[in-house]
Amino acid sequence: MAAQAPPTDELSKLSVEDADNKPQPDASNGNLNHDEDDSEDDAEDASAPAAGGAKKKKKRKPRKKKKNPTQQSDPPRVLISQLFPDKQYPKGEEVEYLNENSYRTTNEEKRHLDNLKSEFLNDYRHAAEAHRQVRQWAAKNIKPGQSLTDIANGIEDSVRALVGHQGLEEGDALIAGMGFPTGLSINHCAAHYTPNAGNKMILQQDDVMKIDFGVQVNGNIVDSAFTMAFNPRYDPLLEAVKAATNAGIKEAGIDVRLGEIGGVIQEVMESYEVEIDGTTYPVKPIRNLNGHTILPYNIHGGKSVPIVKSNDTTKMEEGDVFAIETFGSTGGGHVIEDGEVSHYAKRTDAPKVDLRLSSAKSLLSVINKNFGTLPWCRRYLDRLGQEKYLLGLNNLVSNGIVEAYPPLVDKKGSYTAQFEHTILIRPTVKEVISRGDDF
């Protein structure tokens, strides 16, 4: 999920104020069985008496054990926890640090530090596997002619099914589910667009669509995005942004300065150009969009990763979680806020306001109980059965309790692309937790 730079985006201020109050139920609950019980009741054969007049009983057939599914369904509906019954989820791509500082700790001590975070790592890998399976299904099935609403619902229904939390009961969505709404930003719109109720927008053959969604388990958010285009003329744009993201990931590591990562990303992206209708366009980094750290229940932490060279001397640190994302454009390489708002999040530094509007009070209670500090969209309120909430929502925004995040757009007629992965800066290696066979 995109972060603006400089960090005026208030999502970067979100923090977990009381980690001890974080919901702790096991995120792997829920059942989805596809095998029928093939066992039979005992039966006696009354028509074949044995010697001595005793009835001969049939031997009981052994009861067949129910087997866990071994592959995902289409659409994805099999729990990740059923596909991995030992609850040991696949690791991401583990990459050695380029310039390892051996003086920090011994390898044995590093491994010990890694083991201390086993629950944290497993939750992250659980969320990452759900993200991989859903996005790979989406990439195969999204086609021109589909509505954005159907695309978003297909992704979000699949995420909720795979983590086993539908989010319809109070607090359920805080255990596991969507980390933030599914962004479906098209062409010159770079980020923060998801359809509101009644949206009739249809994906077109010549569109370039960014698909950006998050999956969270116990507040550990995997943030990953990719771009789809159906016209091969846009391939160089997509290749430029994907290569830039991978360059940023390669450069990342303990004690690496964030401004230096931005310089590497910029150099790679600007080495590409794309020809559209006979005109050649340089691929420009969108300089006021950034990568960012991720904290529990907080999609935008306090650090930003620029995608152009800067003087930022802030360092990556052991234990950080980063979303490395880059955006490229055939336009001006700068975005502004424009269009109908769909994305919202409660501010953790919100003032204590004596709300006089009853609809605002009741809506705030719904937000606290179902989303906390996680971002959400209007469709999520609709799904919970909320009605006529816009007046209350606008009141919460005007009082500084909820932040609204409009779509971010470059100039009309331009095309933008995005690729993003979540990486864990572990003591021993950096783990590209969301890496898959697709990208």
UniProtKB/Swiss-Prot annotation:
Q: Where is the composition biased (Basic residues)?
A: 54-68
Binding residues for a divalent metal cation 1 = 212, 223, 420
Any one GO CC term of this protein is: cytoplasm
Compositional bias ranges of the Acidic residues kind:
35-45
| Region span, Disordered | 1-90
Keyword set, alphabetical order = Aminopeptidase, Cytoplasm, Hydrolase, Metal-binding, Protease
Per its record, the protein catalyses: Release of N-terminal amino acids, preferentially methionine, from peptides and arylamides
State where the protein is found: Cytoplasm
Matching Pfam families = Peptidase_M24 (PF00557)
Q: Which residues bind a divalent metal cation 2?
A: 223, 292, 325, 420
Q: Which cofactor does it need?
A: Co(2+); Zn(2+); Mn(2+); Fe(2+)
Primary localization class, coarse:
cytoplasm
Q: Which BP terms in the Gene Ontology apply to this protein?
A: proteolysis
Q: Where is the composition biased (Basic and acidic residues)?
A: 10-23
In terms of domain of life, where is this protein from? Answer: Eukaryota
Record's PANTHER family? METHIONINE AMINOPEPTIDASE 2
Q: Sum up the protein's function in the record's words.
A: Cotranslationally removes the N-terminal methionine from nascent proteins. The N-terminal methionine is often cleaved when the second residue in the primary sequence is small and uncharged (Met-Ala-, Cys, Gly, Pro, Ser, Thr, or Val).
> Would you tell me the protein name for this molecule?
Methionine aminopeptidase 2-2
Species source reads Chaetomium globosum (strain ATCC 6205 / CBS 148.51 / DSM 1962 / NBRC 6347 / NRRL 1970) (Soil fungus)
